Amino acid sequence: LEVTLGHVRAAAAAGADLILTPELTNGLSSSRDRQRALFRREEEDATLAALSVEAKIGGRWLLIGSLGLLTDEPDGRFANRSFLIAPDGGIAARYDKIHMFDVSVSETEIYRESEGYRPGARAVLATTPFARIGMTICYDLRFPALYRRLAQAGAEILTVPAAFNHITGAAHWEVLLRARAIETGCFVLAPAQTGFHPEHRGKGRRTHGHSLAVAPWGEVLADGGTEPGVTLVNLDLSEVGKARRRIPSLGHDREFD
C-alpha cells in the first residue's frame, strides 16, 4: 500500500488528471490461504479506503486497477473488482472482471482463476467530465466483443489494468492492446504489474510489466518498461473522433450466418 500511495502521489505531483494502478493492487498471490489472509470485504478494504482518501486530497480521478475482495459466495470465491474513484473520494463506478484466466501456459505454469474468483456479468461504462471510460481487466483483453460493445456505447478510453504472465505478455500484450485500440478507435490505458512476485519456498510468478498507453490509431504513446514507477502520457481526445471518421467500422456491423 505504501508503494502504491507513493506512486499515486508522484503522479498527482506531476499533474496527472487520471491516475491508474494495476490489477490486484492490494496483493497478487496464487495462494488461496494468503488471499484469504490479505483480502477483505469492499467496505473493510484498507487499500480502497486509503486510495479514496488520496484521490480526495489530490482532487484527482483514480482508477484502482482491481482489488481482490471477499464476497458472500457460498464457495468462498473472491471478486476481482476495479474501481473508478472521483475527486471527491467517492466511488464513481465498479467493474467485476468477466473473463477468468483458466489456461495452461506451459507444463509448469497453469492458472485456474475461476477456482478462486467469481466472474462478473456486466459491462461497465463510466462517465467523467473529460471522457467516457470503459472498464475491463487483464484477460478480458482477449475478448474483443466486450471492447466493441463499450465503444459502441460511447467509450473513448478503455482501461485494461493487468498482471499479464511474462510468457503471454512477451508474445501478445502489445499486439492485443493495439488491436483493441484500432478496432474501437479508443485510447487504451493498461497499467501493469511487473517483476517477480514471490510465494513460499522461493516459488512465485513473474509478470510482464510494460504498462502501455495506446492511441486510437494504434500508436504506442508510452511504455512503462519493466521497472516499478510512474508513466505519464498526454491524451488528445479529439483523436478518437478523427480515427473513427477515417475508419467508421463501429457502424458497419452486418448480420451473417
Where are these regions (language model features)?
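Short beta-strand scaffold segments in enzyme catalytic cores
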Residues: I64-S66, R81-L84, V124-A126, S211-A213, ...
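Short helix-loop capping/hinge motifs at secondary-structure junctions, enriched
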Residues: G90-A93, E219-L221, G241-K242
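Cys-nucleophile CN-hydrolase/nitrilase-fold catalytic domain and related Cys-dependent amidase chemistry
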Residues: L1-E2, G6-D88, A92-D96, N165-E183
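Small-residue-enriched flexible segments
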Residues: T71, A126, R254-F256
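CN hydrolase (nitrilase-like) catalytic-core segments centered on the catalytic cysteine
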Residues: E42-I64, R132, C138-T231
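Active-site catalytic loop in hydrolytic enzyme cores
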Residues: E73-A153, H166-V175, A179, R246-S249
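A conserved C-terminal secondary-structure "cap"
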Residues: V240-D257
